[in-house]
Structures are given as structure tokens and as C-alpha cells.
Amino acid sequence: MQDFQKYLSTAPVLATIWFIILAGLLIEINRFFPDALLVPMK
């Protein structure tokens, strides 16, 4: 169990988990506010 916790605390694993969370958050924001990520063209 200690080896598994050490594996989870390594940088590539933490970066992968962080990017999955960030991507999910951006997808949900884009679902409710579809034009929020676009620059308004005037």
C-alpha cells in the first residue's frame, strides 16, 4: 500500500489527474456557457 501511495504522488500521475479534472471542468463550463471560451468578434 505504501508503494501505491508513493506511485500516486509522483509528478506524471499527479499531472495526469490534474489535467483530467481540468478538462472535465472546462467541458462542463463550455456545456453551460457555450460562448464563454470564444473571443467576441466585433
UniProtKB/Swiss-Prot annotation:
Query: What are the UniProt keywords, alphabetically?
Result: Chloroplast, Membrane, Photosynthesis, Photosystem I, Plastid, Thylakoid, Transmembrane, Transmembrane helix
Where is the chain membrane-spanning? 7-27
Q: Which domain of life is it from?
A: Eukaryota
Of the GO CC terms on this record, one is: photosystem I
Localization terms from the record: Plastid, Chloroplast thylakoid membrane
Q: Has the keyword Transmembrane been applied to this entry?
A: yes
Membrane disposition: Single-pass membrane protein
GO BP terms, alphabetized: photosynthesis
Q: Which PANTHER family match?
A: PHOTOSYSTEM I REACTION CENTER SUBUNIT IX, PTHR36082
The record's family statement is: Belongs to the PsaJ family.
Describe the task this protein carries out.
May help in the organization of the PsaE and PsaF subunits.
Give the protein's recorded name.
Photosystem I reaction center subunit IX
